[in-house]
Amino acid sequence: MPAWLADGRTLAGLDLGDKTIGVAVSDRGFAFAHPRPVIMRRKFSLDAAVLLALLKKENVGAVAIGLPINMDGSEGPRAQKSRAFVRNMAQLSDLPFVFWDERLSTVAAERTLIEMDFSRAKRAGKIDSAAAAFILQGVLDRLQSLDSAARTELGGRTEPGPTDAA
């Protein structure tokens, strides 16, 4: 894992909506995404202050933000808003932000909440954080598969040995 994910750090996932920011945070083992309460959007400076305080409290080392790519692979206005949000956050924090294709994450999150028998009213308050958890879980699963592949390439070792040198 990169140094910015060492020392008990976690990862955060964000799902940006027009009215809320869905937030999820990983466990320290980078296996599970846990939804957190949504941040109600007011204006960027206030939203950023609330978000940065939460990221600090949760000991976050990096942030995955959902990038709403259209089904044809193009980027529309919502993707541009997400990119602008990250550009603005980069001026306030040195945390690394990475984009993650969030296609259908809200649909998957809503299906899960329906299966859990949440009423429409309860789903409305949780959908963005559930979508953030889906985004983050995708990142965590990818990290796990990359870590597993690296261990396989290294013959089960976690560090390169003398025969692995180029």
Swiss-Prot record:
Please state what the protein is called: Putative pre-16S rRNA nuclease
Pfam families to which the protein is assigned, alphabetical: RuvX
The protein's matches in CDD domains, at most eight in alphabetical order, are given as: YqgF
InterPro entries listed in its UniProt record: RNaseH-like_sf (IPR012337), YqgF (IPR005227), YqgF/RNaseH-like_dom (IPR006641), YqgF/RNaseH-like_dom_sf (IPR037027)
Q: Name one GO molecular function term.
A: nuclease activity
The chain's coiled-coil residues are: none
Q: Which family does it belong to?
A: Belongs to the YqgF nuclease family.
Matching entries from SUPFAM superfamilies are given as: Ribonuclease H-like
